Amino acid sequence: PVRSITRTFASGKTEKVIFQALKELGLPSGKNDEIEPAAFTYEKFYELTQKICPRTDIEDLFKKINGDKTDYLTVDQLVSFLNEHQRDPRLNEILFPFYDAKRAMQIIEMYEPDEDLKKQGLISSDGFCRYLMSDENAPVFLDRLELYQEMDHPLAHYFISSSHNTYLTGRQFGGKSSVEMYRQVLLAGCRCVELDCWDGKGEDQEPIITHGKAMCTDILFKDVIQAIKETAFVTSEYPVILSFENHCSKYQQYKMSKYCEDLFGDLLLKQALESHPLEPGRPLPSPNDLKRKILIKKQTTETEVEKKQLEALKSMMEAGESAAPVNMLEDDNEEEIESAEQEEEAHPEYKYGNELSADDLGHKEAIANSVKKASDDLEHENSKKGLVTVEDEQAWMASYKYVGATTNIHPYLSTMINYAQPVKFQGFHVAEERNIHYNMSSFNESVGLGYLKTHAIEFVNYNKRQMSRIYPKGGRVDSSNYMPQIFWNSGCQMVSLNYQTPDLAMQLNQGKFEYNGSCGYLLKPDFMRRPDRTFDPFSETPVDGVIAATCSVQVISGQFLSDKKIGTYVEVDMYGLPTDTIRKEFRTRMVMNNGLNPVYNEESFVFRKVILPDLAVLRIAVYDDNNKLIGQRILPLDGLQAGYRHISLRNEGNKPLSLPTIFCNIVLKTYVPDGFGDIVDALSDPKKFLSITEKRADQMRAMGIETSDIADVPSDTSKNDKKGKANTAKANVTPQSSSELRPTTTAALGAGLEAKKGIELIPQVRIEDLKQMKAYLKHLKKQQKELSSLKKKHAKEHSTMQKLHCTQVDKIVAQYDKEKLTHEKILEKAMKKKGGSNCLEMKKETEIKIQTLTSDHKSKVKEIVAQHTKEWSDMINTHSAEEQEIRDLLLSQQCELLRKLLISAHEQQTQQLKLSHDRESKEMRAHQAKISMENSKAISQDKSIKNKAERERRVRELNSSNTKKFLEERKRLAMKQSKEMDQLKKVQLEHLEFVEKQNEQAKEMQQMVKLEAEMDRRPATVV
């Protein structure tokens, strides 16, 4: 009917506009007319949409591409547009090749309606619009909507679409239970459903499913099992997990087991696979291994008695005794008594009616009794809204206490539990030590958040090995949902949500699991599966091996957003890691009174740094002027396509809306930190970034200079480097001559220090400088004084001995002269008295006496000379020994003093280097603080940042980046300073060894001088 078309396309326009458009298309246009379906072709439908909602935004884009010069695009222009705008630059060029003329011609052939333009290889604005609105230009890679992931990894390596309290259609209190919910949830791709099982109280005592003690209606367990059988593998062939919350007696547990066995048949996985035995350390089977299999998640037997029963049951079953389970029930009197004691009532208000007061049943039962008269009345009231008053409901909620599942398990039910065995969580370290992959634990959202807060990395590692299930906390009586993203970030497999509530959390869940063929299983990223990788879900820095992304979304326009003349605006949010999540920050302006084709033309909303694109999702939501949701779409970032895209919207329940779309320009690229853009551009396109020399060579060629005419010359830098190396070479070291008292060298002691880079600023230590020091000069002066004093003493002793010897010689000579003169005078007197002739005999005698006297004199002189020579030589030797001894002592003192002075100089050098390092570190910290302040100031003054949250995020990101960079700089500086200190100590050690070696050489030379003096020693005297 035309009336239906009018309602669909009106969008605030008058009916006359629609009628006129239909008339122009040659279709019936009367209000009561009807259009033949065969006449209303897709082409007519497309033309009708274009007449009602003209695409001026695409016209503007078309003119921008061709420069508004023609009414068409050439192949080259189309190829350029496709490669520059419609292609993600991060994609591999081999797997995702660039568009070429051939591909552009295929697009023209497919979407250009004008045959003449097709033949010319041109595309009109109409053909361009058809292409942009086609499935080929979908906002996501279409293959991601098919089954594209590997399904051979262990179950723990997948996110699993999971439901909580699947049977409820609404609230947790006074809600209605429905078998149909299981069908719808499974058809939607959910792979884990929950069954709260209670004892039925009818004559047949059939197990029921209900929300115990919450005044919810009941459904039969067997009906649910039948519904699961019918729909479990319609949407997906991968395994379904039934999460049993068991409150039943053992008898009804047995009935549950038989229903599962009889209705599911071979679909039920009753035994572990031979390839994956239930042993510690053995990984779980893969979804492919468990295709078309149903697993039961339930605690196994707890007590020793139950374990013995289970072993006996298995033995009987292997022997083919089918009646064993029933017989076991009959014999199990003790367990029946215990079961009766622990039995819980699903509806205590049914049993007691109005007989019990609040004291008997508690406040919640009393309120229930005041509202309900019998079970029939209760069920009737449950089917309507407003089950109880607000006050009654609040009282129920305040007094409600969750009743845990029984641990008294029938052995027959235990035989059906294998790869999903819940255990009480005792800690991550305990789970790691046990290493049992088929054990799993459930956490309510609050407990899960607590573990994430304190043990985030351990939680991620736990989820690499075994499964975990998160479910809403008990306070969510309105069946609202928590945000699942935080638990996906930590690798939790079963993030269970209330499917009956189409809130934001469910939209994220359904948008995420729409990928991979809606099979209900999504493979976790590599770093969340590999045991050798560590991942912190709260990290604010890029993950090793994962390339961060930048995503910008420009909301251009909307089409057919509402059938009313209302105002609309668009919000764009990002969900992912905490640092990637940006909500309620980016929204367009409100376009008033236009629900048909509002044009927003906003500046791009830029998500600068998405650390983990694999976990991030983009949410685009349209609201009216009353902030009511019109439509939304969840787009996982890892499958998002760049370019100008039409995004078809979904309702709050994620059901596709027929016409509403948002036209956006999406830009995806690799995240590049500020300041590194030029480097990345140079790496991605080196030809555009030639070196300076290459540019100069090109300029020379442009002037007619041939490349062969340009000689290769060495750079000044290399010459300077060689010169510097030559200057820093160590000079030859030569010892002093032996005639000097102390050793020295012609080269500076610090020559070796110059060769060490990084410590050039420290003054050199030279021997000459040490010898010019006041302490050394003072000590040298003292030594010279001691030596001079000794020499004076020796000179005095020389003089004394010389005088003594001279006196002794003079005395002997005088005595000789006297005796000789006496003999001569006696002879002379005799000759005078007797005459010369008479004294001949006497003369001979006198001559003989004189000869004898002379002979004696010579003998005495010889003796005295020998004695003097010995005394003089002994004295000289003694003096020489004393002088040599004191010279040795003085040399030793001098060497030791030089050594001490050098050590002292080294200590000063070390202290000076430490001060230099402290000053350098202080300057670096000051410089870093200055940079941080300047960067923060630049962000605060950046007018391109539109809101406070983005500014704070940029500051936080900057602080994180600066902290990492500054710590790295300080680490490098500390390493450099440590290296310089080591170099200095090494050089100082070399210098000390050099000085000690010189001292030893000086001592050896001194010994050689002493030895030469001893060897040259001869008898001597002074005459």
From Swiss-Prot:
Cofactor(s) this protein cannot do without: Ca(2+)
PROSITE patterns the record matches: C2, PIPLC_X_DOMAIN, PIPLC_Y_DOMAIN
Cited SMART domains: C2 (SM00239), PLCXc (SM00148), PLCYc (SM00149)
InterPro entries, per the entry: C2_dom, C2_domain_sf, EF-hand-dom_pair, PI-PLC_fam, PLC-beta, PLC-beta_C_sf, PLC-like_Pdiesterase_TIM-brl, PLCB1-4-like_EFh
Keywords annotated in UniProt: Calcium, Cell membrane, Hydrolase, Lipid degradation, Lipid metabolism, Membrane, Phosphoprotein, Transducer
Residues annotated as catalytic: 164, 211
Location in the cell: Cell membrane
Protein task: Activated phosphatidylinositol-specific phospholipase C enzymes catalyze the production of the second messenger molecules diacylglycerol (DAG) and inositol 1,4,5-trisphosphate (IP3) involved in G-protein coupled receptor signaling pathways. PLCB4 is a direct effector of the endothelin receptor signaling pathway that plays an essential role in lower jaw and middle ear structures development.
Source organism: Bos taurus (Bovine)
PTM sites of type Phosphothreonine: 734
Pfam families: C2, PI-PLC-X, PI-PLC-Y, PLCB1-4-like_EFh
Top-level taxon in the UniProt lineage: Eukaryota
One Gene Ontology term, aspect cellular component: plasma membrane
Region of interest (Disordered), ranges: 711-742, 930-958
Biased composition (Basic and acidic residues): 943-957
EC number: 3.1.4.11
Lineage: Eukaryota, Metazoa, Chordata, Craniata, Vertebrata
Protein's UniProt name: 1-phosphatidylinositol 4,5-bisphosphate phosphodiesterase beta-4
Expression tissues: Preferentially expressed in the retina.
Disulphide linkage map: none
Domain named PI-PLC X-box: residues: 149-299
C2 domain sequence ranges: 532-657
PANTHER family referenced in this protein's UniProt entry, alphabetically: 1-PHOSPHATIDYLINOSITOL 4,5-BISPHOSPHATE PHOSPHODIESTERASE BETA-4, PHOSPHOINOSITIDE-SPECIFIC PHOSPHOLIPASE C FAMILY PROTEIN
SUPFAM superfamilies referenced in this protein's UniProt entry, alphabetically: C-terminal domain of PLC-beta, C2 domain (Calcium/lipid-binding domain, CaLB), EF-hand, PLC-like phosphodiesterases
Primary gene name: PLCB4
